[in-house]
Amino acid sequence: MASIINKQIISPTGRNMEIINYEILKKYPLCDRCFGRLYAKLLHTTNTERGRALKLYKALELEAKIKKAKEKGINYEEELELLKALAKSGVDEIRLEDIEIEKENCPWCRGIFNKQKMEKLLNKAIELLKEYDFDTFLIGTHIPEEIKDLEKEIETEFMESIKQEFGREFGKMLAVRLDKAPDKEYPDIVVHINPYTEEIYLQINPLFIKGRYRKLVRGIPQTRWPCRKCRGKGCELCNYTGKKYPISVEEIIAKPFLEATKGVDAKFHGAGREDIDVRMLGDGRPFVLEIKEPKIRKIDLNKIAEEINKDGRVEVLNLEFGVRKDKVIFKNTPHRKTYRALVECSDKITDEELKLLEKELENRTIYQKTPKRVLHRRADLERIRKVYKVKTSKVDDNHFEMIIYCDGGLYIKELISGDDGRTNPSVSSILNKNCICKELDVLKIHDNNLLEKG
């Protein structure tokens, strides 16, 4: 123990440096645990054992000095003052007769590590956790401001905060009682505790389900669309549903998950979105469903997929459990797409014109201003996107089908119509005819296993 309880060490400059601040005990009668916490980064032992050893060593040293001072008849007031401070902080082994001081309460921990108090908090937390299904947890410790201020005043370079120690020790106890594992990165539940006020509340972290969806019919938005008039509150226009459209991909997928998990709400995160009148075919669009405050986490994904797919309007594929960062990937990962468009032209079209169209649009840069149809909700910007490949097939004199492989974020309807010159070039400008998109399907999102990157 001599390496840490020695009062001084030699610095690189050759000067003595204080490492143990016993003087702090004159102002604050820190208990063994709290005094040891000031030097928590020294030695592999508990804070209580470390603090006890430091105090006993100093008390022994002071008692010896005082006895010698008495024998020699010299002043020992300074040593006596510190020895009394040690007695107030809980050192009751002092043998000097003129030291009769009662132990004072520790101003730092205020007894929060008392075994009975810890058990009381533990039982309270377990009672709150009973109604939830979870595997991992984290302790969130909340400390009063006056305790934080005290820590700043007495801080040493070797100290750990009382917040750290309480969270660690309480977490160990909870892990043993529940046979659950603490998890700092992705806990199912965070148990928030203020050990000073004995307040406890739970933070139920979301359950994330990732997969892909196919939208097989037109006329359904991807997410719930609030009524524009009442903004979701319910009015005569929306038949008091609060919605512009009666159903969405989000609601079709979320409903069975909410029923199975007993969650309070769900949020849908898609890798982009298709228009209401556009189908999403092929192998589907990646999505993450965020279920808020689930009570049940162990659910049968295959069974839920079967239930969703029975609807006939939406299908889900490749369902698996995800994590929070999966939903962020969508916002930062560009991906190309393949579309099928049915185009209607004002004048007759020829096979030669369609061949010209394929040639003109191959590896072509498109300059596209925000479409007029969405200007009311999006900034008027110019986007630069690229069309890589186009394949056409004639349907009749005024209709043809296009397979378009292009950058994500390109508005296909406006690529076809030209949007009164706001998209350049366009199918209309190349063919010199008025063309419109009659039907549009997303055939593939070239995401390179977007969800697996997480």
Curated annotation (Swiss-Prot):
Q: Which positions are catalytic residues?
A: D275
* Top-tier EC class: isomerase
Keyword RNA-binding present in the record's keywords: the answer is: yes
Reaction catalysis annotation = uridine(54) in tRNA = pseudouridine(54) in tRNA; uridine(55) in tRNA = pseudouridine(55) in tRNA
Q: What is its EC number?
A: 5.4.99.25
Known Gene3D superfamilies for this protein? 3.30.70.2510, 3.30.70.3190
Question: Pfam families, from UniProt?
Answer: Pus10_C, Pus10_THUMP_arc
Please give one Gene Ontology molecular function term for this protein. tRNA pseudouridine(55) synthase activity
Record keywords, A-Z: Isomerase, RNA-binding, tRNA processing
Q: Which PANTHER family match?
A: TRNA PSEUDOURIDINE SYNTHASE PUS10
Main role?
Answer: Responsible for synthesis of pseudouridine from uracil-54 and uracil-55 in the psi GC loop of transfer RNAs.
Name assigned to this protein: tRNA pseudouridine synthase Pus10
Per the UniProt record, the source organism is Methanocaldococcus jannaschii (strain ATCC 43067 / DSM 2661 / JAL-1 / JCM 10045 / NBRC 100440) (Methanococcus jannaschii)
